[in-house]
Amino acid sequence: MVEPANTVGIPVNHIPLLKDELDIVIPTIRNLDFLEMWRPFLQPYHLIIVQDGDPSKTIAVPEGFDYELYNRNDINRILGPKASCISFKDSACRCFGYMVSKKKYIFTIDDDCFVAKDPSGKAVNALEQHIKNLLCPSTPFFFNTLYDPYREGADFVRGYPFSLREGVSTAVSHGLWLNIPDYDAPTQLVKPKERNTRYVDAVMTIPKGTLFPMCGMNLAFDRELIGPAMYFGLMGDGQPIGRYDDMWAGWCIKVICDHLGLGVKTGLPYIYHSKASNPFVNLKKEYKGIFWQEDIIPFFQSAKLTKEAVTVQQCYMELSKLVKEKLSPIDPYFDKLADAMVTWIEAWDELNPPTKA
């Protein structure tokens, strides 16, 4: 049995890394009591809370946190007609927080994620580990069998090309979860009591050309490097699919990172995922996606961007055209999704105009 860490008595970190360069984005429909546990690690940072569902409901935030809160009315007011690209009644709404942030880095976490313990019993400062991951280079072009070569006590193994040892900039840090695993509905139904108790003390770069299922509940990224591609798609209310929002974004960012020569890491840090979602509700949301992903994944595996695409926005616009061309025959939903991808980029550029040289 794995338990969350007890953070009572841990002092608030008064020398936090990247304090003025990082926002924490939290999507929620409920009071944020869980932040009390995270106070020692997250209180120094600015929070962007994206309230999903009923905008008239009041969300309580523990005292002492610096935050701004956006509900659906705010999203509609700020984006106008372009608000149609932001999902409703789905945690995909979190990507609105990425858009309104003005910081270089983003850490996003779900409200059912608690502080984990490492094998020694020490509370894991997930944000600190994400920052370390993002500030260290990645090695997507050649796999190092000792995993992260830049970590203390590790290095490049014999046979690793010296020409590749500088690595590349890291765009994304994908963390993992103890307790409730991030399973799809069929697996949840077959293994309802399964809990993840394995703490693997490793960080690795996902190799170029390899896709992965990105989970949005413990994720950090360099907004300046990859932000415009972190669109969690059209999911939830009024859409034929849900629970594919973070994975859609992950497939898009991986194709773009591979094209632009950026790195994506996975592994540490762990959080404690406290609550299993209802597998029957999940199955209804995922049902079409379970079949569609057998076409979606080969699409992303074969997606090729042109050499003219040199910015994230240009890459994303090319990808949206490919989605319309290749995936729309599967279902009209993909035509709508491709249009929403374009709207997302237009809205991003409106709120984040390019700086003039």
Curated annotation (Swiss-Prot):
Principal location listed in the UniProt entry: cytoplasm
Site (Required for activity): R158, R165
Pfam families: RGP
Tissue: Predominantly expressed in shoot and root apical meristems. Expressed in epidermal cells of leaves, inflorescence stems and seed coat. Expressed in pollen.
Keywords: Acetylation, Cell wall biogenesis/degradation, Cytoplasm, Glycoprotein, Golgi apparatus, Isomerase
Annotated localization: Cytoplasm, Cytosol; Golgi apparatus
Enzyme class: isomerase
Motif DXD motif: positions: 110-112
Subunit structure: Heteromers with RGP2, RGP3, RGP4 and RGP5.
Free-text comment about domains: The conserved DXD motif is involved in enzyme activity.
Name of this protein: UDP-arabinopyranose mutase 1
Species name: Arabidopsis thaliana (Mouse-ear cress)
Encoding gene per record: RGP1
